[in-house]
Each structure stands twice: as C-alpha cells, then as structure tokens.
Amino acid sequence: PMMLTELVSAADRVGATSSRLAKIDALAELLSRADPTEIPAVVGLLLAAPRQGRLGVGWRGISALDIAHADSPALTVGEVDQALDALA
C-alpha cells in the first residue's frame, strides 16, 4: 500500500518546481508506484477533491480533534480514503 508520506512528498516536489517536465515526472513516478485500486484516492487527494466529494469538514473541526501524533509516518492512502468514507 502507498504511504501518505509518498503522496505528500510528490505533491511537495510538484509545488516546488516551475518545470512542467519535472511536475510530470514526479506525478508519473507516484502513479506508477500506486496500486491500481489506489489511483482514484491518490488523484483525488492530489487535486484536493476527494472521491467522496465535499465533506463539510474544515480546518477548525480537524484542529479541534485531540489526537496524538505518531512517532513515525504510518498512514496509508487507503486508510485516509477509508476515513474520508466514514465522514462522507
């Protein structure tokens, strides 16, 4: 399964360059590593348009949650997608 940190890293690389070819390379590399079943979730998260549609949850609601931070990155794209399913 694809780790969320992989998606974030690719998004950071895309945002950090003005080179269209570098953007394409970063996205192509990311999508080539994704399982075919993860592609809709990956694309939705990259576009800030999750496949679940508008959730009506903003930064204020998320920041109010009392959740401990993980010692190391552990979330997968699939787990984030499932959590968004539960909110939808």
What residue spans do the PLM features occupy?
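N-terminal nucleic-acid-engaging modules of covalent nucleotidyltransferase systems
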Residues: P1-A88
